[in-house]
Protein backbone atom coordinates (compact mmCIF):
# COMPACT_ATOMS: atom_id res chain seq x y z
CA UNK A 1 0.00 0.00 0.00
CA UNK A 2 1.33 3.41 -0.91
CA UNK A 3 2.43 5.61 1.99
CA UNK A 4 1.70 8.75 -0.04
CA UNK A 5 -1.07 10.89 1.43
CA UNK A 6 -2.57 13.80 -0.46
CA UNK A 7 -2.03 17.03 1.45
CA UNK A 8 -5.26 18.40 2.86
CA UNK A 9 -5.99 21.92 1.61
CA UNK A 10 -8.24 24.15 3.69
CA UNK A 11 -10.91 25.74 1.58
CA UNK A 12 -11.47 29.48 1.90
CA UNK A 13 -14.72 30.32 3.72
CA UNK A 14 -16.97 33.34 4.26
CA UNK A 15 -15.11 34.64 7.36
CA UNK A 16 -11.84 34.59 5.39
CA UNK A 17 -13.37 36.73 2.63
CA UNK A 18 -15.00 39.09 5.14
CA UNK A 19 -11.64 39.58 6.85
CA UNK A 20 -10.11 40.83 3.59
CA UNK A 21 -11.95 44.18 3.80
CA UNK A 22 -9.48 46.92 2.91
CA UNK A 23 -6.66 44.44 2.33
CA UNK A 24 -5.17 42.74 -0.70
CA UNK A 25 -7.87 42.73 -3.42
CA UNK A 26 -9.97 39.57 -3.57
CA UNK A 27 -9.66 37.68 -6.88
CA UNK A 28 -12.93 36.18 -8.14
CA UNK A 29 -14.03 34.57 -11.40
CA UNK A 30 -17.03 32.56 -12.57
CA UNK A 31 -16.84 28.81 -13.05
CA UNK A 32 -19.43 26.37 -14.35
CA UNK A 33 -17.49 23.14 -15.00
CA UNK A 34 -14.98 20.95 -13.15
CA UNK A 35 -12.08 21.36 -15.63
CA UNK A 36 -12.31 25.16 -15.61
CA UNK A 37 -12.68 25.22 -11.82
CA UNK A 38 -9.49 23.18 -11.53
CA UNK A 39 -7.61 25.67 -13.71
CA UNK A 40 -8.89 28.71 -11.80
CA UNK A 41 -8.56 27.29 -8.30
CA UNK A 42 -4.86 28.03 -7.87
CA UNK A 43 -5.26 31.71 -8.73
CA UNK A 44 -8.64 32.68 -7.28
CA UNK A 45 -9.93 33.35 -3.79
CA UNK A 46 -13.57 32.85 -4.78
CA UNK A 47 -15.31 31.03 -7.61
CA UNK A 48 -18.87 32.09 -8.39
CA UNK A 49 -21.17 29.57 -10.01
CA UNK A 50 -23.16 32.39 -11.53
CA UNK A 51 -26.60 32.18 -13.05
CA UNK A 52 -24.79 33.66 -16.05
CA UNK A 53 -24.32 29.97 -16.86
CA UNK A 54 -27.72 30.20 -18.51
CA UNK A 55 -26.38 32.63 -21.12
CA UNK A 56 -22.76 31.48 -21.32
CA UNK A 57 -23.29 27.71 -21.41
CA UNK A 58 -26.96 27.12 -22.24
CA UNK A 59 -27.50 29.92 -24.77
CA UNK A 60 -30.40 31.60 -22.97
CA UNK A 61 -31.11 35.29 -23.75
CA UNK A 62 -30.88 36.25 -20.06
CA UNK A 63 -30.67 34.64 -16.62
CA UNK A 64 -34.41 34.55 -15.92
CA UNK A 65 -34.82 31.01 -17.31
CA UNK A 66 -32.14 29.46 -15.10
CA UNK A 67 -33.46 26.83 -12.67
CA UNK A 68 -32.37 25.65 -9.23
CA UNK A 69 -31.57 22.22 -10.68
CA UNK A 70 -29.21 23.83 -13.21
CA UNK A 71 -27.40 25.72 -10.46
CA UNK A 72 -27.06 22.57 -8.37
CA UNK A 73 -25.67 20.59 -11.31
CA UNK A 74 -23.01 23.20 -12.10
CA UNK A 75 -22.29 23.82 -8.42
CA UNK A 76 -21.51 20.14 -7.96
CA UNK A 77 -19.14 20.22 -10.94
CA UNK A 78 -17.25 23.27 -9.65
CA UNK A 79 -16.90 21.77 -6.18
CA UNK A 80 -15.44 18.60 -7.69
CA UNK A 81 -12.93 20.57 -9.73
CA UNK A 82 -11.73 22.92 -6.98
CA UNK A 83 -9.96 22.41 -3.66
CA UNK A 84 -8.95 25.78 -2.25
CA UNK A 85 -11.15 28.61 -3.55
CA UNK A 86 -14.42 29.46 -1.85
CA UNK A 87 -17.37 28.39 -4.01
CA UNK A 88 -20.49 30.58 -4.03
CA UNK A 89 -23.58 29.56 -6.00
CA UNK A 90 -26.18 31.99 -7.32
CA UNK A 91 -29.76 31.46 -6.25
CA UNK A 92 -31.70 31.71 -9.52
CA UNK A 93 -34.65 33.94 -10.30
CA UNK A 94 -37.79 32.77 -8.50
CA UNK A 95 -36.01 30.74 -5.82
CA UNK A 96 -35.75 33.36 -3.05
CA UNK A 97 -37.94 36.42 -3.76
CA UNK A 98 -41.06 35.04 -2.05
CA UNK A 99 -41.42 33.89 1.54
CA UNK A 100 -38.15 33.66 3.51
CA UNK A 101 -39.06 30.10 4.47
CA UNK A 102 -39.15 29.10 0.81
CA UNK A 103 -35.85 30.84 0.19
CA UNK A 104 -34.34 28.92 3.11
CA UNK A 105 -35.57 25.58 1.78
CA UNK A 106 -34.06 26.32 -1.64
CA UNK A 107 -30.79 27.65 -0.22
CA UNK A 108 -30.44 24.70 2.14
CA UNK A 109 -31.03 22.26 -0.72
CA UNK A 110 -28.50 24.08 -2.87
CA UNK A 111 -25.82 23.96 -0.18
CA UNK A 112 -26.53 20.35 0.82
CA UNK A 113 -26.44 19.02 -2.73
CA UNK A 114 -23.43 21.02 -3.92
CA UNK A 115 -21.30 21.38 -0.80
CA UNK A 116 -20.77 25.06 -1.65
CA UNK A 117 -19.73 27.52 1.04
CA UNK A 118 -22.35 30.22 0.37
CA UNK A 119 -25.17 31.44 -1.84
CA UNK A 120 -25.57 34.76 -3.65
CA UNK A 121 -28.79 36.73 -4.06
CA UNK A 122 -29.60 39.96 -5.86
CA UNK A 123 -30.41 42.54 -3.19
CA UNK A 124 -33.45 44.78 -3.05
CA UNK A 125 -36.04 46.06 -0.55
CA UNK A 126 -38.00 42.79 -0.62
CA UNK A 127 -34.90 40.62 -0.17
CA UNK A 128 -33.19 42.25 2.84
CA UNK A 129 -35.32 40.37 5.38
CA UNK A 130 -34.61 37.13 3.52
CA UNK A 131 -30.85 37.70 3.71
CA UNK A 132 -31.14 38.17 7.46
CA UNK A 133 -33.37 35.09 7.74
CA UNK A 134 -30.86 32.91 5.88
CA UNK A 135 -27.80 34.17 7.76
CA UNK A 136 -29.48 33.63 11.14
CA UNK A 137 -30.07 30.02 10.12
CA UNK A 138 -26.48 29.34 9.18
CA UNK A 139 -26.39 30.08 5.46
CA UNK A 140 -23.64 32.53 4.40
CA UNK A 141 -25.00 35.03 1.87
CA UNK A 142 -23.30 37.27 -0.66
CA UNK A 143 -25.37 40.24 -1.81
CA UNK A 144 -25.51 41.97 -5.20
CA UNK A 145 -26.42 45.61 -5.92
CA UNK A 146 -26.42 47.91 -8.92
CA UNK A 147 -27.09 46.27 -12.26
CA UNK A 148 -29.12 43.17 -11.40
CA UNK A 149 -29.27 40.67 -14.29
CA UNK A 150 -32.34 38.92 -12.87
CA UNK A 151 -34.25 42.22 -13.04
CA UNK A 152 -33.36 42.83 -16.69
CA UNK A 153 -36.98 42.50 -17.83
CA UNK A 154 -38.04 45.22 -15.39
CA UNK A 155 -35.04 47.47 -15.95
CA UNK A 156 -35.26 47.27 -19.74
CA UNK A 157 -31.88 45.72 -20.48
CA UNK A 158 -28.33 45.64 -19.20
CA UNK A 159 -27.76 49.31 -18.39
CA UNK A 160 -25.24 50.97 -16.06
CA UNK A 161 -26.76 52.22 -12.81
CA UNK A 162 -26.20 54.97 -10.28
CA UNK A 163 -25.55 57.92 -12.56
CA UNK A 164 -28.59 59.92 -11.37
CA UNK A 165 -29.17 61.23 -7.84
CA UNK A 166 -32.20 59.21 -6.70
CA UNK A 167 -30.97 55.96 -8.20
CA UNK A 168 -27.54 56.55 -6.70
CA UNK A 169 -29.04 57.06 -3.24
CA UNK A 170 -31.20 53.94 -3.56
CA UNK A 171 -28.29 51.69 -4.56
CA UNK A 172 -26.15 53.01 -1.70
CA UNK A 173 -28.95 52.33 0.78
CA UNK A 174 -29.47 48.83 -0.64
CA UNK A 175 -25.77 48.09 -0.18
CA UNK A 176 -25.87 49.33 3.42
CA UNK A 177 -29.01 47.32 4.17
CA UNK A 178 -27.50 44.20 2.59
CA UNK A 179 -24.38 44.45 4.75
CA UNK A 180 -26.43 45.22 7.87
CA UNK A 181 -28.58 42.14 7.18
CA UNK A 182 -25.49 39.96 7.54
CA UNK A 183 -24.10 39.46 4.03
CA UNK A 184 -20.38 38.64 4.19
CA UNK A 185 -19.67 40.49 0.92
CA UNK A 186 -21.54 42.50 -1.72
CA UNK A 187 -21.11 42.37 -5.49
CA UNK A 188 -21.33 45.86 -6.99
CA UNK A 189 -22.12 45.61 -10.70
CA UNK A 190 -22.35 48.18 -13.48
CA UNK A 191 -22.45 51.36 -11.42
CA UNK A 192 -20.75 54.75 -11.71
CA UNK A 193 -17.17 54.60 -10.44
CA UNK A 194 -17.68 57.20 -7.74
CA UNK A 195 -20.69 55.36 -6.36
CA UNK A 196 -18.75 52.09 -6.20
CA UNK A 197 -16.06 53.81 -4.13
CA UNK A 198 -18.68 55.40 -1.90
CA UNK A 199 -20.31 52.01 -1.27
CA UNK A 200 -16.93 50.46 -0.48
CA UNK A 201 -16.22 53.17 2.08
CA UNK A 202 -19.73 53.05 3.55
CA UNK A 203 -20.08 49.35 4.36
CA UNK A 204 -18.03 47.13 6.64
CA UNK A 205 -17.93 44.05 4.40
CA UNK A 206 -15.91 43.61 1.18
CA UNK A 207 -17.26 44.88 -2.12
CA UNK A 208 -16.60 42.79 -5.23
CA UNK A 209 -16.67 44.96 -8.32
CA UNK A 210 -17.70 44.11 -11.85
CA UNK A 211 -17.89 47.15 -14.08
CA UNK A 212 -17.54 49.30 -10.96
CA UNK A 213 -14.20 50.55 -9.60
CA UNK A 214 -10.63 49.46 -8.93
CA UNK A 215 -11.31 50.84 -5.47
CA UNK A 216 -13.56 47.90 -4.61
CA UNK A 217 -12.21 45.26 -2.23
CA UNK A 218 -12.12 42.68 -5.01
CA UNK A 219 -12.99 42.08 -8.65
CA UNK A 220 -14.96 39.48 -10.58
CA UNK A 221 -15.47 38.82 -14.28
CA UNK A 222 -17.24 36.17 -16.30
CA UNK A 223 -14.33 33.89 -17.13
CA UNK A 224 -15.49 33.27 -20.68
CA UNK A 225 -15.53 37.04 -21.34
CA UNK A 226 -12.07 37.52 -19.84
CA UNK A 227 -10.65 34.68 -21.94
CA UNK A 228 -12.14 36.02 -25.17
CA UNK A 229 -14.53 33.19 -25.99
CA UNK A 230 -17.14 35.53 -27.47
CA UNK A 231 -16.91 37.94 -30.38
CA UNK A 232 -18.46 40.75 -28.30
CA UNK A 233 -16.79 42.16 -25.20
CA UNK A 234 -18.64 44.29 -22.63
CA UNK A 235 -17.10 47.69 -21.85
CA UNK A 236 -16.03 46.62 -18.35
CA UNK A 237 -14.16 43.49 -19.50
CA UNK A 238 -10.43 43.38 -20.16
CA UNK A 239 -9.61 40.45 -22.43
CA UNK A 240 -6.64 38.45 -21.21
CA UNK A 241 -6.81 35.89 -24.01
CA UNK A 242 -8.27 35.11 -27.42
CA UNK A 243 -9.56 31.58 -26.93
CA UNK A 244 -12.22 32.10 -29.59
CA UNK A 245 -9.47 32.67 -32.15
CA UNK A 246 -7.28 29.85 -30.82
CA UNK A 247 -10.18 27.38 -30.81
CA UNK A 248 -11.10 28.41 -34.35
CA UNK A 249 -7.53 27.77 -35.53
CA UNK A 250 -7.37 24.39 -33.80
CA UNK A 251 -10.70 23.20 -35.20
CA UNK A 252 -9.80 24.41 -38.71
CA UNK A 253 -6.50 22.49 -38.55
CA UNK A 254 -8.31 19.36 -37.34
CA UNK A 255 -10.92 19.59 -40.09
CA UNK A 256 -8.19 20.03 -42.72
CA UNK A 257 -6.28 16.97 -41.45
CA UNK A 258 -9.42 14.82 -41.40
CA UNK A 259 -10.39 15.77 -44.96
CA UNK A 260 -6.83 15.14 -46.18
CA UNK A 261 -6.72 11.79 -44.31
CA UNK A 262 -3.73 12.97 -42.26
CA UNK A 263 -5.64 12.21 -39.06
CA UNK A 264 -5.50 9.75 -37.47
CA UNK A 265 -1.87 8.94 -38.21
CA UNK A 266 0.47 6.21 -36.94
CA UNK A 267 0.84 7.93 -33.55
CA UNK A 268 -2.92 7.92 -32.90
CA UNK A 269 -3.96 4.42 -33.99
CA UNK A 270 -3.56 0.90 -32.59
CA UNK A 271 -1.78 -1.95 -34.37
CA UNK A 272 -2.20 -5.67 -33.85
CA UNK A 273 0.79 -7.35 -32.24
CA UNK A 274 2.78 -9.57 -34.53
CA UNK A 275 2.13 -13.28 -34.03
From Swiss-Prot:
Binds 1 Mg(2+) ion per subunit. It comes from Phenylobacterium zucineum (strain HLK1). It comes from the Bacteria. Catalyzes the reversible reaction in which hydroxymethyl group from 5,10-methylenetetrahydrofolate is transferred onto alpha-ketoisovalerate to form ketopantoate. One of its GO terms (biological process) is pantothenate biosynthetic process. This is 3-methyl-2-oxobutanoate hydroxymethyltransferase. Its EC number is 2.1.2.11. PANTHER family: 3-METHYL-2-OXOBUTANOATE HYDROXYMETHYLTRANSFERASE (PTHR20881:SF0). GO terms for cellular component: cytoplasm. Its cofactor is Mg(2+). Transmembrane segments: none annotated. SUPFAM superfamilies: Phosphoenolpyruvate/pyruvate domain. GO terms for molecular function: 3-methyl-2-oxobutanoate hydroxymethyltransferase activity; magnesium ion binding. Keywords: Cytoplasm, Magnesium, Metal-binding, Pantothenate biosynthesis, Transferase. Homodecamer; pentamer of dimers. Belongs to the PanB family. It is found in: Cytoplasm. CDD domains: KPHMT-like. 3-methyl-2-oxobutanoate binds at residues 51-52, 90, 120. Mg(2+) binds at residues 51, 90, 122. Pathway: Cofactor biosynthesis; (R)-pantothenate biosynthesis; (R)-pantoate from 3-methyl-2-oxobutanoate: step 1/2. Pfam families: Pantoate_transf (PF02548). The active site is at 189 (proton acceptor). It catalyses: 3-methyl-2-oxobutanoate + (6R)-5,10-methylene-5,6,7,8-tetrahydrofolate + H2O = 2-dehydropantoate + (6S)-5,6,7,8-tetrahydrofolate.
Amino acid sequence: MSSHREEKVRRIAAPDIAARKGGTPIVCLTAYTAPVAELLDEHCDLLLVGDSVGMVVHGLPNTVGVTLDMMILHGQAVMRGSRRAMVVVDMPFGSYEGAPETAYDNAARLMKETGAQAVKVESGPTVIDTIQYLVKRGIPVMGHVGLRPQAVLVDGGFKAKGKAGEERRRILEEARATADAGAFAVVVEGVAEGLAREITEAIEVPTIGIGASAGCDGQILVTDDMLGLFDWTPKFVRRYGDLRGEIGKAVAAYAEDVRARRFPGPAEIYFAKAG
